[in-house]
C-alpha cells in the first residue's frame, strides 16, 4: 500500500531522490522554502539538462505536481524510502550519495569537454593539412583520439555511469 500521509505529512518528501530503472543518474531534490515545496530535477545536469525547479502543491498530506489540466500525485512507500511519480520510481538517497553523483557527473563532463576539444583539434589539424575526411589516414587519426578517450570513459564509469558519453564513430565495432 502506498501512503503519503502520516508523520510529517508532505515534509516526508523533503530530501534527495535518485531515479531508478534508467541508464543515467538523475537526482531530484525536494525542498521546502518559506512554506512552499519545490522539486529541483536533475541537480547533476548541465546545459539543456540542467536543474529545473518546479513548484509543488500539498494536497491531503501528499505533494502533487500541477500540470495545468490536473494534479499528478507523488506517492511514497510505507517506509518513505521510495517515491513514485507517473511511471518513475525514485529511491531516497542521503546528501553524501548526492554529492558523489554530482562530483562524478562533473568528472564525466570534464572528460567529455577534453575529448571534444582534442577531437576538434585533431580534425582541424588534419583538414588544414589537406587530409580528406574520407581517407583511411583521417579515419585512423580520429580513431586514435577516440580510443584514448573511450578507455578513459570506461575507467571513469567503473565508479558509475556517465549521463552523457560521446559517440565514438571511428572505432572498430
What role is predicted for each listed range?
Residues 119-137, 162:
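Charged, low-complexity interaction regions
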Residues 136-148:
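Intrinsically disordered, low-complexity charged/polar segments
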Residues 11-26:
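Tryptophan-anchored aromatic micro-motifs
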Residues 2-4:
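C-terminal motif of bacterial Sec signal peptides marking the signal peptidase cleavage site
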Residues 84-121, 147-171:
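Edge beta-strand at a domain terminus
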Residues 75-87:
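Short, exposed beta-strand-loop hairpins at the edges of beta-sheets
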Residues 22-69, 148-151, 158-160, 166-170:
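N-terminal glycine/threonine-rich, aromatic-flanked beta-hairpin/loop signature
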Residues 6-8:
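Bacterial signal peptide processing site
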Amino acid at each position: 500500500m502506498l501512503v503519503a500521509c502520516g508523520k510529517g505529512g508532505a515534509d516526508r518528501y523533503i530530501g534527495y531522490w535518485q531515479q531508478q530503472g534508467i541508464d543515467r543518474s538523475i537526482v531530484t531534490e525536494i525542498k521546502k522554502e518559506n512554506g512552499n515545496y519545490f522539486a529541483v530535477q536533475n541537480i547533476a545536469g548541465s546545459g539543456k539538462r540542467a536543474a529545473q525547479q518546479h513548484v509543488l502543491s500539498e494536497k491531503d498530506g501528499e505533494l502533487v505536481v500541477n500540470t495545468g489540466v490536473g494534479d499528478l500525485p507523488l506517492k511514497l512507500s510505507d517506509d518513505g524510502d521510495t517515491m513514485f511519480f507517473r511511471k518513475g520510481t525514485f529511491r531516497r538517497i542521503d546528501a553524501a550519495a548526492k554529492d558523489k553523483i554530482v562530483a562524478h557527473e562533473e568528472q564525466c563532463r570534464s572528460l567529455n569537454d577534453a575529448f571534444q576539444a582534442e577531437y576538434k583539434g585533431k580534425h582541424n589539424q588534419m583538414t588544414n593539412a589537406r587530409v580528406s575526411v574520407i581517407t583511411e589516414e583521417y579515419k585512423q587519426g580520429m580513431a586514435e583520439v577516440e580510443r584514448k578517450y573511450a578507455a578513459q570513459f570506461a575507467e571513469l564509469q567503473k565508479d558509475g555511469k556517465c549521463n552523457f558519453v560521446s559517440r565514438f564513430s571511428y572505432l572498430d565495432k
